Structures are given as structure tokens and as C-alpha cells.
């Protein structure tokens, strides 16, 4: 990690939970991205201020079993700091995530592509922990998944970084967002503009190119016109947990769902 990232990380006092909500995703790819993020945070000296949560809403039993198996391997790797010792499918996925994401891009990116409590324990290494939780009933889908985390463990964290299953972010971006949130006590949400990576089809590569060219302009325009306000995009955002829990619970609307 660059010296400036380590310096920023050294000033962070708040505790942040990195949340990865998943639903019948490919476990190796999901865990590979989290390993890449975890390794980058540890190298930045920020491991002690972050925990990772895999929040599973998976309904397919085969995928569920695979999730727990690969999570245990990720736990072992983070616990021992033995990055590069991944096996089989996870090794290939980690190589792709590291090559095309954290180390190569230097920017937040997205690919185009109930175990009780914090089941199974923790993974440490420079203070970074990874937890896995699967809900027996995926009530309210992703929003319900995040709500369940807040109800169980939200009081233990100042901020939460909400990812999508295909999100990949650098320690530099994550540390900077947490530092900005800590320095601005009236900020409720700070979010990063995503970029596509690893696109393969012609259409997806066109989208990736357009996003690379126009994304910074659109982001700057939104920041200018919305000033200190914004809508929540749903991912790649650091959120102040206490404010979120107090203000963002919405009632269930009456009538038939659309």
C-alpha cells in the first residue's frame, strides 16, 4: 500500500463493517473479491478498523454448502496471512480479481459478470475479521438482509460499507471514504462511482468504455447539482449506521406488490 494510504488509515478511529450481501452467487468469485479487498486493507495497515461480513440469502443448498466451504478457506487465509495459498477454484478467482481489480485499476470497480449468529468464528491477521451468516428466510430480499445485519450487529459499528456481489474496491478508496465520513459528522452516506471491469462481450465492452469516458463527468455533475444531498445507489457506499437505523426503516405498503 502507498505511504499516503497507510497514513490515512492510521488516523481512523471508527469501526467499519464491509457488507457483501449474496443470493445464489458463485461463491469462489465472491470470496476472491473479498480476499483481494482484505489483503489490500491489511497491507494498508487498516485491518484493525474493518470487519468483513458475508451476508447470504442463498436458497440453493449446493451453493450454500459451497459458500461455507470456501468461506472457511478464506478464513484460514486471512487468519494466517498466507495470501497466494488458495486452492483450486478459489486460486483462479483470486488471481483474476487481483490482476484486473485491486492492484491493476487503483479504483473502485464492478465486474460485469441461518447459520446462527456469526457462524464459525473469525479470521484475523492484522485485526481483520471475516464473518459468514446465512438467513433461513430471505425476508425483504437485499434490504431485509441489510436490516438483519443492523438489528444483530449494527450497534457494534460506526459505519458500514455496502457492496454488491460483484463489487471490488481498493483499500485506498475504502480508507479515504471512511476517513471522510469520520471527519464529517453530519454526513450520512458517502458513495463511490462504480466502473465496469473484465467485460468480454461487445456490448459490455462498449458499456465499459462509455463508463470510463463519461463516468467521471457524470459523477462530477451529480456532485455539483445535488451538492450535499444524493440518492443511495445501493452499493459501494459508506453509511453511518446509527443514522441509518434511526431514519431509514420504511413501512410495508398496503396492497399488491407491483
Q: Where in the sequence are the language-model features?
A:
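Internal catalytic domains of large membrane-associated glycosyltransferases
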Residues: 2-101, 106-110, 117-258
Amino acid at each position: 500500500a502507498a505511504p499516503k494510504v497507510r497514513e490515512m488509515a492510521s488516523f481512523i478511529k471508527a469501526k467499519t463493517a464491509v457488507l457483501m450481501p449474496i443470493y445464489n452467487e458463485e461463491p469462489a468469485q465472491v470470496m476472491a473479491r473479498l480476499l483481494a479487498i482484505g489483503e489490500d486493507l491489511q497491507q494498508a495497515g487498516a485491518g484493525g478498523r474493518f470487519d468483513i461480513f458475508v451476508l447470504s440469502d442463498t436458497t440453493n443448498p449446493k451453493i450454500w454448502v459451497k459458500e461455507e466451504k470456501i468461506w472457511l478457506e478464506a478464513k484460514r487465509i486471512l487468519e494466517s496471512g498466507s495470501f497466494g495459498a488458495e486452492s483450486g477454484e478459489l486460486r483462479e478467482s483470486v488471481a483474476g480479481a487481483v490482476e484486473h481489480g485491486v492492484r491493476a485499476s487503483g479504483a473502485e470497480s464492478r465486474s460485469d459478470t441461518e447459520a446462527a449468529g456469526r457462524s464459525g468464528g473469525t479470521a484475523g491477521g492484522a485485526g481483520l475479521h471475516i464473518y459468514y451468516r446465512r438467513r433461513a428466510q430471505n425476508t425483504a430480499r437485499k434490504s431485509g438482509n441489510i436490516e438483519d445485519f443492523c438489528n444483530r450487529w449494527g450497534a457494534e459499528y460506526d459505519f458500514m460499507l455496502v457492496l454488491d456481489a460483484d463489487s471490488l474496491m481498493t483499500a485506498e478508496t475504502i480508507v479515504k471514504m471512511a476517513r471522510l465520513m469520520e471527519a464529517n459528522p453530519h454526513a450520512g452516506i458517502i458513495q463511490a462511482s462504480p466502473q465496469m471491469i473484465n467485460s468480454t462481450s461487445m456490448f459490455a465492452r462498449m458499456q465499459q468504455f462509455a463508463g470510463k469516458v463519461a463516468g467521471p463527468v457524470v459523477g462530477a455533475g451529480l456532485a455539483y447539482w445535488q451538492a450535499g444531498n444524493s440518492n443511495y445507489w445501493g452499493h459501494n457506499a459508506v453509511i453511518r449506521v446509527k443514522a441509518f437505523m434511526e431514519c431509514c426503516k420504511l413501512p410495508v405498503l398496503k396492497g399488491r406488490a407491483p
